[in-house]
Amino acid sequence: VLEYAGYYTDDEHPFEAFLKKISGYLKEDGKLLIAIENKFGLKYWAGSREDHTGKFFDGLEGYIDTDSKVRTFSKEALKKIITDAGYGKAEFYYPFPDYKFPVQIFSDEYLPREDDLNIGLDTFDNTRMMLFNENRVYANLLKEKKFEFFANSFFIEVTK
């Protein structure tokens, strides 16, 4: 629900404020688990609609043409939000093809090999275009070590 924080507070930085509030409910050794879409996920470049607004390329373009307060973020933006909210450590995992229908989950310690990602990449929750072959692009992203940037979503384990 992090992406909806803009609806729950008038704070200038609603996502950080939301995470700060949640930290008060965590034990000192507790963990916060976040599942969220990556605004730069490959599926959005390939023709999937933004999951929350239903518009093509909405997150990629910075949500400029929407009244929605929903926002998704890149890995770097999420790291900053988490740090600014006062948390210490964030471990990123990469559910594939995304967190709603994961077939595999990767980590920074175990990133996929090309044959790990050779599956059908249908979108079950929305209509989409198929602008290119995602499996072929993933193969190139893996060679260039860019999988994390284009992962469709994140599962994040956050500690104080």
Regions found by a protein language model. Name each.
Residues V1-H13:
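A short SAM/SAH-binding and catalytic strip from SAM-dependent methyltransferases
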